[in-house]
Amino acid sequence: MNTLIRMGISAAAAAMAAGALAAETNELEEAESSPLSVEVTVDFFSSYMWRGQICSDAPVWQPAATLGLDLGDFGALSANVWSSFKLTNRREGSPVRNMGNQEIDYTVSYAKSFGDFDIEAGHIWYTFPNVDDGESNEELYLSVAYNNPIVTPTAAVYWDYRDNDDDGLFYGNLALAHDFELCDSLTLTPSVSLGMGTDAYLRAYVDDVNKTAFLDQTTGLALAYAVTDWLSVGAQVNYTWIVDRDARRADYMGRDKNQRVWGGVNVAFSF
């Protein structure tokens, strides 16, 4: 206002300018406080690893989109769609290359914080477009994370409720991670995780293993850089190996494979 007056603008014009500025500010504040959010990510990995299994030995790119709704004190809802595409489908001894969609997953979830604890529950629908019989899987999951300055432990359990095995097809994961802020925009995150499957879970993926066992252990290092408030880029490297001897012998990870170094880069847009 002082600048406007010094420039000789009339009081009426100044008031109009102030009103317009206030309206614009209110719109910006309203936009910033909008309960809706959208995030789009694209990951590029050297291979597609899932719970210690090599789902693709070829490089993949994995786009995803998440719509979030902040419910304030009542928590938050989100809906996510994720997909994995092979960058190449070249087979040994064949010059043919093609790009193919391996998988499309749909997730709905609810999350709420209770003090230092973050609790999330959701449903995942796994679909495989290129599978002739149209096979799909569905899981319910629950995860609990404890936020603290030292290290953040997270425990998660997944239940394939459509499986016909009476024993229940469950997979669990325990993880530890910590964010180190190297500077205002750069974060380094080391992590370790350990997966466990019930005997029914193992029977669904490999033969001759009928027991509950620790399966996959992964040690990772991730680096994330916030380019702007809405754009970030990152990179990660991981080492995964199969813990249980019987699962190794049964080729749980893949044929004649019991360990893998893998990683990639990613970009994320938030609105």
Model-inferred region functions:
Residues 1-37:
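Cleavable N-terminal export/targeting peptides
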Residues 28, 52-56, 89-99, 131-138, ...:
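Outer-membrane beta-barrel translocator domains and adjoining extracellular loop/strand segments
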Residues 36, 57-61, 100-104, 117, ...:
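Residues that define the transmembrane beta-barrel architecture of outer-membrane proteins
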Residues 40-42, 65, 79-81, 108, ...:
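Membrane-embedded beta-strand positions of outer-membrane beta-barrel proteins
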Residues 44-50, 81-89, 112-114, 125-129, ...:
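Transmembrane beta-strands of outer-membrane beta-barrel pores
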Residues 72-79, 115-121, 149-155, 183-188, ...:
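Repeated loop/turn-to-beta-strand initiation elements of outer-membrane beta-barrel proteins
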Residues 137-218, 222-225:
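Detector for outer-membrane/organellar transmembrane beta-barrel domains
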Residues 225, 257-271:
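Outer-membrane beta-barrel "beta-signal"
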